[in-house]
Amino acid sequence: MNRSDQSERVRRQVIDTAKRLFFENGYDQTTLRQISTAAGVSHGSIYHHFADKEGIFLALVTEAFDEIQQITDREFSEARDPYLRLSLKWAILVAAASIDVRVAELLDIAYASKKISTEIVASSTLRHRNWLGEQLPDWTDNDFYAATLVLKGAMAAVVEDKLSTDRLSMEERIRSVLRAALFGFGAAPDQIAEILERVLDGMARVDPFALYKF
């Protein structure tokens, strides 16, 4: 194994171990020392790849969002409407947070972190522009940025509901997020209603926990 492969192996071990420990113990209760010990790597090796625990968490969150997109692409390859494809991705994330409070807790931490939240919004804004640019040719970068902030706010709100009153059902959370996000991204009311029903029907084909199995 060359040096590059070894370095990537260590990085992978750290992320996978941190993911497991964050779920088992919680983010705040997990230390870098615990991660390095459980991963079987030195403390210095972690700092070679990540500045701090938040950096590991950012890498984990970024991968999770990419994996959700891969699941959407795989399970719904026949869906050509970009609004529908994005809605399915958003719904998978809401479903995972609704089913397992640990997912909601980690998302709550991610949205509360200025560093992580900024990265999520930046990467999501670019993705949304790439996906919806043809549908919204007159939109500027700031238009997509503002709509992404609306989505983030809706996601953060349903996560807060899960962690506080737990009043809404999973379906109600999905409907709430999709209504706000699709309206924010310029979808017509009749289009939103149709997408909502197609997403809820399609969710039966997806295991939201595919992202969280170890």
Predicted regions and their residues:
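Amphipathic alpha-helical packing segments from all-alpha helical-bundle domains
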Residues: Y111-E160, E172
